């Protein structure tokens, strides 16, 4: 009975754990790495065709995004997840496949012009469709006997619709051990979905630590704050454009806007229209509607019992086709437009920015974290001009930040979750956190509970019967590793720009002692360059 750590170890993305007992091979999560990597990750030790079962904690791509890839490489086993996770994976994995195909085509156009070999996408839409045939939906809080020696139960993790912590009872050589995989533990008091459910016993815990070194601020009343932004924008006669992630954040915005309308928080503009312009968000919203009874919290269920849909209201419009999307900007009435992607790197949001950024009466409202190097980050940090579709756009719109509701538990909430376990686990493994955060939280767990706690490296393996480490993973660091997604590519290019700036400073320092005429000429050249790019 051996547990080997594969991904999201001393890093945040690419969650994957490999468990073997007897002749059975199991994966818990199979996520895609996103963004820069710190360490070289251990590959899954066996051919995917030998994997019997995969258990998915939730649908986010950093936990599910490589499922089509292992299917492409021969996996034909069974994937277990909650019904809502299964439904969300059905749309998110296909969307991810479209991105892989798009980026491969983008690279190949450049490769053909340069005479370089073409690349193939990591996986395609057919792989995503085929792997969905291997999903088996599971109910929360039911114990499933998967095979001799393996029982599992999914409990609500409160992170995303359908998210779960997984309790796993594994028996080998007449010894049974209970392993709990936390998944991503949610923040408390979020709209729509339930708070995290606690687990009361475990021999081993594999636990996330995303915010294991910080505490959340007391959140404002988001509906009230959002109403203020809408009112200011509509009073000027402009549009409110909200870049938002299609799954989760879009539905939260709908929840707040429904409150604004039903509680009459915007009496000056009671009948305003709201457009969802993201096919993925429309599909995800339908999934929310289909999983109400399993996943919604008590407050949302009270609304439903009263005949009120918590994410639907008069004036809500959806745009699915590209023609419907284009028509939004022909409507001159002030309106709210919610579109993806949340960091403005791709998707229809870029068209809405093109039509609204130049307007001093419009507002762009950010409701989520913006990665450095993305268009969203540039706008949030005061960019005066941006380029969209080859056209330079002057930024005259108001740029506002409404700090998003965090989807992850903070240090105190993580500690409370672990403290609900009544017995003393043999080992607690801290994963899914930046290296310094994972190490900090492992030390915090040891000091608080006197548990053996460690932040494993990818490739570290433990015998769960003896509680002994049986393999050391690689400690090899990487400076740059292939990553997926436009945001990652943009960040790499931005890093090149920073490096060029550092080189320029070095050259300037070497010029000390040169003739004043040459120094003056050099200064003029630098100032001319700055004038060209200072936006």
What would you call each of these model-derived segments?
Residues 150-154, 287-295, 415-416, 465-478:
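Short, surface-exposed amphipathic charged segments that create phosphate/polyanion-binding patches used
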Residues 191-206, 292-299, 370-396:
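Short, compositionally biased "basic patch" segments
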Residues 229-375, 386-387, 422, 437, ...:
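Hard-cation-handling environments
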Residues 359, 434-479:
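C-terminal, active-site-flanking charged/polar segments
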């Amino acid at each position: 009975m051996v547990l080997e750590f594969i991904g999201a170890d001393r890093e945040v993305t690419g969650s994957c754990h490999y468990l073997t007992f007897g002749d059975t091979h199991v994966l818990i999560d199979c996520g895609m790495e996103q963004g820069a990597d710190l360490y070289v990750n251990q590959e899954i030790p066996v051919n995917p065709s030998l994997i019997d079962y995969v258990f998915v904690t939730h649908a986010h791509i950093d936990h599910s995004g490589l499922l089509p890839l292992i299917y492409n490489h021969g996996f034909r086993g069974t994937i277990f997840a909650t019904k809502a996770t299964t439904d969300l994976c059905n749309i998110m994995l296909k969307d991810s496949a479209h991105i892989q195909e798009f980026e491969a085509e983008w690279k190949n156009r450049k490769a053909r012009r340069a005479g370089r070999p073409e690349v193939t996408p990591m996986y395609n839409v057919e792989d995503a469709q085929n792997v969905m045939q291997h999903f088996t939906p599971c109910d929360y809080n039911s114990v499933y006997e998967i095979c001799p020696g393996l029982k599992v139960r999914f409990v609500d993790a409160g992170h995303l619709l359908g998210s779960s912590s997984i309790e796993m009872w594994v028996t080998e050589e007449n010894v049974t051990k209970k392993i709990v995989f936390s998944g991503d533990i949610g923040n408390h008091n979020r709209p729509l979905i339930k708070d995290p459910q606690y687990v009361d016993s475990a021999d081993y815990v594999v636990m996330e630590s995303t915010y294991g070194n910080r505490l959340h601020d007391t959140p404002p009343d988001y509906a009230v704050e959002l109403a203020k932004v809408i009112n200011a924008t509509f009073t000027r006669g402009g549009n409110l454009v909200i870049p938002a992630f299609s799954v989760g954040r879009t539905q939260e915005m709908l929840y707040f806007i429904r409150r604004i309308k039903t509680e009459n928080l915007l009496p000056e503009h009671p009948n305003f229209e709201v457009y969802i312009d993201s096919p993925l968000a429309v599909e995800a919203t339908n999934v929310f509607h289909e999983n109400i009874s399993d996943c919604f919290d008590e407050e949302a269920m009270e609304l439903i019992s009263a005949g009120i849909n918590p994410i639907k209201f008069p004036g809500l419009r959806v745009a699915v086709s590209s023609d419907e999307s284009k028509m939004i900007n022909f409507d001159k009435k002030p309106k709210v437009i919610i579109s993806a992607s949340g960091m403005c790197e791709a998707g229809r949001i870029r068209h809405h920015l093109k039509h609204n950024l130049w307007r001093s009466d419009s507002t762009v409202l950010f409701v989520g974290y913006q990665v450095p190097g993305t268009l969203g980050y540039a706008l949030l940090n005061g960019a005066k001009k941006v380029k969209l579709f080859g056209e330079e756009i002057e930024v005259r719109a108001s740029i506002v930040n409404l700090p998003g509701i965090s989807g992850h538990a903070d240090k105190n909430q993580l500690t409370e979750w672990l403290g609900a376990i009544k017995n003393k686990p043999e080992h607690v493994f801290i994963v899914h956190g930046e290296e310094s955060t994972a190490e900090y939280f492992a030390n915090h767990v040891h000091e608080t509970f006197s548990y053996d706690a460690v932040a494993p490296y990818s490739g570290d393996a433990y015998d769960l019967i003896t509680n002994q480490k049986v393999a050391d993973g690689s400690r090899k660091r990487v400076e740059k590793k292939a990553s997926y997604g436009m945001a990652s590519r943009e960040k790499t290019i931005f890093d090149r720009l920073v490096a060029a700036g550092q080189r320029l400073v070095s050259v300037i320092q070497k010029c000390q002692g040169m003739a004043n005429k040459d120094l003056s000429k050099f200064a003029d050249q630098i100032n001319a360059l700055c004038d060209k790019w200072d936006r």
